[in-house]
């Protein structure tokens, strides 16, 4: 997931048991493919003449109606609960249904042999927004010990899609599934995103806070069908093992779960 909008000038957990049909997949959920774009590029669709926003790796998609489009889709964008810049009180914005539609047209998902119906786009946006909000709540849970100490709320600086790039944990869990199929799933994540979170630090009570960049890895997995036969999925959210602080946070949570019991689908650090 992780599809937000920002102005160019602006410098594993089950998410609520959300069940979505195959028509409601977020356009940044990629199938593994050797032709997947590099992680620094737009995770939706590249264009030679598009300007790519470095904060969300997205081209500036127009909100105008497409030729041949039958439905009138809303152009209003929803403000998320996720803070954006450390220098302002702005929040990330989600794409409007019309922008989502335009992105799907660019990917060839609508029109011709496309598999997404026009009347499914608004539901896609709702599911997309719901999942991003759930992922952010999981980030806040990880950040809580640091937030309690600094009294500074974290912010989301930027993010990138990495379809087809397996995280070390995803590889390990897949290997465990091959070796111990009765205890672990062999399923690989169908998408991955890396979020760069700004963790607030306060050296003195009277001084303004500073922010430290912390990378989070989000692996998206398909889940079992619900009672209505609709597919579900969950997201494994955790800080990347690229610093001692992150390793400490993950080990602390692992030990807490060993003592009190796991609160999500996996208890590995």
Swiss-Prot record:
Broad enzyme group: lyase
Keywords carried by this UniProt record: Heme, Iron, Lyase, Membrane, Metal-binding, Mitochondrion, Mitochondrion inner membrane, Repeat
Intrachain S-S bonds: none
Spans annotated as Disordered: 1-72
Transmembrane feature ranges: none
GO MF assignments: holocytochrome-c synthase activity; metal ion binding
Subcellular locations according to the entry: Mitochondrion inner membrane; Mitochondrion intermembrane space
HRM repeats: 25-30, 41-46
A GO CC term attached to the entry: mitochondrion
Keyword Heme belongs to the record: yes
Enzyme nomenclature, EC number: 4.4.1.17
Pfam families membership: Cyto_heme_lyase
Reaction(s) this enzyme catalyzes, per UniProt: holo-[cytochrome c] = apo-[cytochrome c] + heme b
Family assignment from sequence similarity: Belongs to the cytochrome c-type heme lyase family.
Note: Present with 3870 molecules/cell in log phase SD medium.
Entry function: Lyase that catalyzes the covalent linking of the heme group to the cytochrome C apoprotein to produce the mature functional cytochrome.
Name of the protein in its database record: Holocytochrome-c synthase
Organism: Saccharomyces cerevisiae (strain ATCC 204508 / S288c) (Baker's yeast)
């Amino acid at each position: 997931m992780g599809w937000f909008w920002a102005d160019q000038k602006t410098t594993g957990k089950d998410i609520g048991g959300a069940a979505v049909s195959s028509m409601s997949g977020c356009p940044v959920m990629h199938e593994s493919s050797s032709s997947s774009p590099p992680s620094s590029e737009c995770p939706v669709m590249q264009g030679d003449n598009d300007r790519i926003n470095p904060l969300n790796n997205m081209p500036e998609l127009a909100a105008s109606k497409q030729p041949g489009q039958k439905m009138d889709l809303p152009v209003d964008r929803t403000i998320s609960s996720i803070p954006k810049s450390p220098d302002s009180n702005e929040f990330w914005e989600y794409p409007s249904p019309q922008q989502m539609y335009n992105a799907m047209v660019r990917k060839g998902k609508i029109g011709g042999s496309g598999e997404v119906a026009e009347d499914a786009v608004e539901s896609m946006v709702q599911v997309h927004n719901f999942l991003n909000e759930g992922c952010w709540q999981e980030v806040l849970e990880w950040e809580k010990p640091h937030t309690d100490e600094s009294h500074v709320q974290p912010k989301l600086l930027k993010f990138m899609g990495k379809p087809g790039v397996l995280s070390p944990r995803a590889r390990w869990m897949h290997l465990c599934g091959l070796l111990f199929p009765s205890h672990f799933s062999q399923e690989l994540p169908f998408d991955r995103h890396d979020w760069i979170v700004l963790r607030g630090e306060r050296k003195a009570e009277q001084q303004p806070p500073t922010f430290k960049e912390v990378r989070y890895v989000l692996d998206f997995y398909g889940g079992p069908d619900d009672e209505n036969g609709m597919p579900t999925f969950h997201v494994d959210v955790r800080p990347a093992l690229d610093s001692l602080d992150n390793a400490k946070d993950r080990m602390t949570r692992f030990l807490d779960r060993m003592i009190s019991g796991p609160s999500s689908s996996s208890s590995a650090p």
